[in-house]
Amino acid sequence: MQDIRNIAIIAHVDHGKTTLVDKMMLAGNLFREGQDLSSQVLDSNDLERERGITILSKNVSINWKGTKINIIDTPGHSDFGGEVERVLNMADGCLLLVDAFEGPMPQTRFVLQKALEIGLKPIVVVNKVDKPNCRPEEVYEMVFDLMFSLDATEDQLDFPVVYGSAKNGWMSEDYNKPTTDITYLLDKIVEVIPAPKQIEGTPQMLITSLDYSSYTGRIAVGRVHRGHLKDGQQVTICHRDGSQEKTKIKELHVFNGMGHQRTEQVDCGDICAVIGLEKFEIGDTICDAENPEALPPIAIDEPTMSMLFTINDSPFFGKEGKFVTSRHISERLNKELEKNLALRVRQVEDANDRWIVSGRGVLHLSVLIETMRREGYELQVGQPQVIYKEIDGVKCEPIEELTINVPEEFASKMIDMVTRRKGDMTSMINLGERVDIEFNIPSRGIIGLRTNVLTASQGEAIMAHRFKEYQPYKGDIERRSNGSMIAMETGTAFAYSIDKLQDRGMFFIDPGEDVYYGEVVGEHVHENDLVVNVTKAKQLTNVRASGSDDKARIIPKTVMSLEECLEYIKEDELVEVTPKSMRMRKIILDHDQRKKANKS
């Protein structure tokens, strides 16, 4: 029996989780000398590297002095709540990584709470102690207070602390005494984290994540809870709905370094990948062929937001994407459901090309849209809608805990903005020059808030939020008050016409871009929508000498990210997403029909 430790890493965005794992793998000699280190091995998907967030959990294992350490990476964002709970079920302990300057952040709190509820033993790593003006001692106190407020047990509160800098590759018990490597941390993991309990009996394994290989098909990943699994063994799969199905294991793999390694037998407590099973979902149990006993399935957080997905039917349909038909989009959404547990997809009645997709928040859904866009899909999405529930006959809506960290001079602006959106301030803590303000705010109020908060604080604000509970409906919230500027006809936008319209509002297009009628090309300064002609060129006659006019001086266009577009559009608008561009448009493109619809 090999000695095993299963450990989950919990950290906030940018606190150095992925860098630390890179260094742990170096210590376990996982990279050949001279191998190109694409830093951030764990964030293997492009989107994750760009945004610095971990969306899907990864497994890596290293060998340290004869002990196998399985490192399980957890997503740090509560929008991926479904992912977090499954992953923590595989671990026996957790590594809480915090920045020596920022301290524990609100998102970390969400994952940590789940970990403490399951009863994992924590080790705290205070990272980035080499940064100027960091405050390791205070951060340690903050972590202790946080754990105490999350009802940690006495055993959990008696956690060891390791100080260090993952970037510079050292860990030590005292931040004033840098060492040369991270052996102190690895020794602590082996010493403090309990080995998995050996439970004898018939085999049981809960499937906690999926892998896919074009060669072998779907692969089930999970931790062996009881007994042993053998290569070629006959097993029964117990589904979440209670039905059972007999099948056979074709191959068993354990994690070794970055990849898999085939093995004959997997013992209790190790994490493995099972190949050759058919029809299984996350949350099913693989158990004994003769006496199947299912493990309790994992409860997944309910979705709180939904969005309309439809095929792209704009005049520029099919010019930029590879997959544009309803069949393509439908297949892609169904494929996503296999992996993405917190997602729901429902086809709109009487329409083959419209789906209502529900998820944990704007970020959760925008990551899906961005991934599809990069794969070559064209689609259109509507404004995010909050999912209401009726509880005891009262209409209720999701409420989130919102934390905004800003320089002190902007605090009053922030409080004003959030209270206008029906937020209630719950606490305000002074941290030197900055303040931490906490609110409870309806999810509706968060849509479109981030852009305004960053503008009002000159980009200084750090904002984080997580779902708390359902509460009675709080009343109407005022949305963006400015109207849209809408292109009158299809064609190429000219600098001459944009120049003449600049006093009417700000533009989302540059001269030379193609536009179509009904596309939202800018924001009007007044509340009503304005139809503008941006495709008009300058007429030249003999009277006008060609060079005497003033040159057009054009203000650069406002560039918006996908999330900003989703938060910006109104009920009668859509975002058109293609691999090369993102445009906003009216649902009814024709101006006369739109007027009629608005009147009725």
Residue ranges and their predicted role:
Residues 1-104, 142, 210-213:
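P-loop NTPase switch module centered on the Walker A-proximal segment
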Residues 15, 27, 31, 77-78, ...:
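Conserved nucleotide-binding/hydrolysis micro-motifs of P-loop NTPases
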Residues 30-57, 80, 146-159, 190-203, ...:
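Active-site phosphate-binding and catalytic loops of NTP-dependent enzymes
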Residues 94-156:
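Conserved C-terminal guanine-recognition region of P-loop GTPase G domains, centered on the G4
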Residues 148-282, 402-407, 440, 466, ...:
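Conserved catalytic-core segments of large NTP-driven translation/proteostasis enzymes
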Residues 225-351, 374, 556:
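Catalytic P-loop NTP-binding/switch module of NTPases
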Residues 255, 260-263, 441, 454-456, ...:
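Long insertion/accessory domains within large nucleic-acid-processing enzymes
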Residues 300-435:
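Charged, conformationally dynamic linker/hinge segments
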